[in-house]
């Protein structure tokens, strides 16, 4: 990967879905997936990009799914919240083990001895000093997704864009696994997404991004070098703006 060009984003909020971490497994964490993503993060930090990180919990437990199985919704969401902490701990340890860049794991709920409580001023200071800040435990509240947490932290930390790393190449007109005529959108407006009822993220999260004019790019983080290319201005995945 060449560093001749200058990156176009000073600070990003990277949202990674939990499913990305499970690799080819049906459940849990795949160490090879962790290492590959950690290396991509390390590379962009070393060229000067500031990175905030939010990780989902779909590889472990989703609150909404657990509630459908009969658990209380609040308890289900608390299990999902704790699952994000597990994923975040794994990512922090992986980054620390393969690179020299610094990390800080913050939680929206108190978890003494495991990670520190989220603090806005400290997070801003750390990001400015090129420390990767991992925001875990979602918003700390039930009924809110990690997409909502990503939008919230992205707006709070004045990120230039939310980059949503998934297992697919971007936003499609329909599910490409079910419809051979589905096509990939390269650019969309917030209005387009709402009108077409495209499932980019939940409505609460998406509305928050729209109201604060926070651009979102959905891309396939499994594609080698995709994160770096986006940072350098390549039109990879799908960009959503006003």
Swiss-Prot record:
Biological processes annotated in GO: 'de novo' CTP biosynthetic process; UDP biosynthetic process
Binding site for UMP: 77, 139-146
Family the UniProt entry places it in: Belongs to the UMP kinase family.
Xref: PANTHER family: URIDYLATE KINASE, URIDYLATE KINASE PUMPKIN, CHLOROPLASTIC
Primary localization: cytoplasm
Residues reported in the UniProt entry to bind ATP: 15-18, 58, 62, 166, 172, 175
Subunit and interaction comment: Homohexamer.
Protein name: Uridylate kinase
Function according to Swiss-Prot or TrEMBL: Catalyzes the reversible phosphorylation of UMP to UDP.
Signal sequence residues: none
Activity: how regulated: Inhibited by UTP.
Subcellular location: Cytoplasm
EC number assigned by the record: 2.7.4.22
Pfam family, one: AA_kinase
GO cellular component: cytosol
One annotated GO molecular function: ATP binding
Involved pathway(s): Pyrimidine metabolism; CTP biosynthesis via de novo pathway; UDP from UMP (UMPK route): step 1/1
